[in-house]
Amino acid sequence: MITIFNKLKQSLSKTSNTISTGIDKIFYKKKLDQTTLNELEELLISSDISITVVTHIIEKFKNVKFDKTIDSDTVKEAIAKLIEQQLSKSEIPFTLSENKLNIILICGVNGVGKTTTIGKLSALYSAQGKKVAVAACDTFRAAAINQLSSWVDRANALLITGEVSADPASVAYRAIQESIKQNIDILFIDTAGRLHNNKNLMDELSKIVKVIKKLDENAPTHSILIIDAVTGQNTYNQIEYFNDVTNLTGLIITKLDGSAKAGVLVGAVQKFNLPIYFIGIGEQIEDLKIFNRHDFSRSLVGL
């Protein structure tokens, strides 16, 4: 049976192979000197870890006490611990309120896996005995509603839809009212994929947020941005724009199993102080896992 840790290692293999092989080459029968430090710095930057974070890691790495002979596994252990420290703000639990409706706004650009992720989240919480509903606010694509319906059925959740091309904010409004009426525990609001620099679509998202707050000034309980791990450095722009509109509470990272750019998560967490609630490490409904910075850091360097 494949453990969660082994599945994570497999998912991060594209990034970890680069880092692990690079460290093996840099420290093969070599001393720890300025040349090797420079090579290590270049390797980490090439893995999409931000320059700011890499600089900090290298400075800390210089102060690690090593034996006279240093091997690559020892270096990997040290780097993993330093990366884990950089991710200290990432492991805030995804908490829900008891005895009230939790409104979870899900947003992101096109193709990051929002619908699939909502299906997996719905299944996760339905299995825990929660009453789950999903608002289909991507109203301009009939295919999106059909795809969402399939996932929601598998999760034994309630799907709340509007007419095709209906105002997404009106669907969100009705979904909240219906969820309150039916004593729903969690309402996931699925929004249309939108480019972060498309003003009209971002205004539409802003309108959804305003409508939510009309019904509950403390809502949404969570505003979550779905990030495709393949995105790389553009992750920073996406977080910045969506955060301005929705006041993000956290991130979910998808498609780790297909990315060679997973290192970007380290810098993103450090810059925006946002937790990573879940990570997607496969296509199956059970392949959405709670983020664990210790396991992630070790897997990232191939340990």
Swiss-Prot record:
EC number per UniProt: 3.6.5.4
Q: Which controlled-vocabulary keywords does the entry list?
A: Cell inner membrane, Cell membrane, Cytoplasm, GTP-binding, Hydrolase, Membrane, Nucleotide-binding, Receptor
Q: Which residues bind GTP?
A: 108-115, 190-194, 254-257
Q: Which SUPFAM superfamilies match?
A: Domain of the SRP/SRP receptor G-proteins (SSF47364), P-loop containing nucleoside triphosphate hydrolases (SSF52540)
Which superkingdom? Bacteria
Cellular localisation: Cell inner membrane; Cytoplasm
Query: What reaction is this protein's catalytic activity?
Result: GTP + H2O = GDP + phosphate + H(+)
Q: What class of enzyme is it?
A: hydrolase
Q: Name one GO molecular function term.
A: ATP hydrolysis activity
Question: Which Pfam families does the entry mention?
Answer: SRP54, SRP54_N
Topologically, how does it sit relative to the membrane?
Peripheral membrane protein
Q: What InterPro entries is this protein classified in?
A: AAA+_ATPase, P-loop_NTPase, Signal_recog_particl_SRP54_hlx, SR_rcpt_FtsY, SRP/SRP_N, SRP54_GTPase_dom, SRP54_N_sf
| Entries under Gene3D superfamilies matching the protein | P-loop containing nucleotide triphosphate hydrolases (3.40.50.300), Signal recognition particle SRP54, nucleotide-binding domain (1.20.120.140)
GO biological process entries: SRP-dependent cotranslational protein targeting to membrane
Cellular component annotations (GO), alphabetically ordered: cytoplasm; plasma membrane
Family assignment? Belongs to the GTP-binding SRP family. FtsY subfamily.
- Cite the record's note on assembly: Part of the signal recognition particle protein translocation system, which is composed of SRP and FtsY. SRP is a ribonucleoprotein composed of Ffh and a 4.5S RNA molecule.
Under NCBIfam families, the record lists: ftsY (TIGR00064)
What PANTHER family does this protein's entry cite? SIGNAL RECOGNITION PARTICLE RECEPTOR SUBUNIT ALPHA
Q: Describe the function of this protein.
A: Involved in targeting and insertion of nascent membrane proteins into the cytoplasmic membrane. Acts as a receptor for the complex formed by the signal recognition particle (SRP) and the ribosome-nascent chain (RNC). Interaction with SRP-RNC leads to the transfer of the RNC complex to the Sec translocase for insertion into the membrane, the hydrolysis of GTP by both Ffh and FtsY, and the dissociation of the SRP-FtsY complex into the individual components.
Name of the molecule in the record: Signal recognition particle receptor FtsY
